[in-house]
Amino acid sequence: NDIIRIGAEQELVLVSKDWSPALNYDVFIKEAQEPLLTTELARFNLEINLPPFEFKTNAFQKMESTLREKLSCLQAIGDDNQTKILLTGILPTISWDYLNFECMTPNPRYEALNELLRSKRNSNFQIHIKGLDELLTAHPNILFEACNTSFQVHLQIPQDKFVERYNWSQLIAAPVLASAGNSPLLMGKRL
């Protein structure tokens, strides 16, 4: 198949008026009735899965307009429930209080993932990030992963072009990530 398609996933954070995580993901799932909307690891995260578009001159405009439409719908639900929709890499206001099992989305998939990764490690998850400050911790579950969200682009290409395009994507990943990272704070540490 020579048709090139592009799609995306937009992860987002739900926050309350004081910018702390809002654990009301279920309200959005129920009220939106949107097949492109799905849960994420934590009760304060959601994900919009955009449909794939044929990669032609207007593919990015279609992606943007579809995403804006979905975000607008979610923000209307948020307005009715004192919740803001936030697109950010790392939520700078997150605290350890939100990284416990009560904040995990109740889904057997996430519980199984946590159990599997814990059993493979046979220890806590070690986190060590050096920046202006240093964050060094051992966390007992996978919820530390819920601190960050992303915008992921998916590109479907012809099989014979995969190696070249994959290598190209690896070359640009670091500078794109460096320029797109938007929160230097995690657990009160300057990273």
Model-derived regions: residue spans:
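Phosphate/nucleotide-binding catalytic core
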Residues: N1-L191
